[in-house]
Design a protein with these regions (language model features):
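Divalent metal-cofactor coordination and adjacent catalytic microenvironments
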Residues: 1-94
Length: 94
């Protein structure tokens, strides 16, 4: 679930301070990242509020990589993939 706190953090990550229709795009990207974490077996307790620093960073990195036409998308997706590897080995399963 994308909380308001997570949405605000994602907006800051993509350097967006105003609220408008693009907030829905950011929220959708965060939801995709959360579902991807769920897909690799992360327990729901870690995904309900995304307060764990590693989980939160993965979501924010995914949003940053995929929002708009980020010229650093490939580097950011590599960073996201590395975070997934760390999460897989970090005891985040139920």
């Amino acid at each position: 679930m994308v909380t308001q706190d997570l949405l605000n953090a994602a907006k800051i990550r993509v350097r967006k301070t105003s609220s408008n229709v693009l907030d829905e795009d950011i929220k959708q990207l965060a939801e995709v990242a959360i579902r991807d974490l769920e897909r690799i077996g992360v327990a729901g307790i870690y995904l309900s509020a995304c307060t764990d620093p590693l989980i939160r960073e993965a979501v924010l990195t995914y949003v940053n990589a995929n929002f708009g036409a980020n010229p650093d998308r490939d580097k950011l997706m590599s960073a996201y993939d590395m975070l997934l590897i760390k999460i897989k080995g970090g005891g985040y399963r139920a």
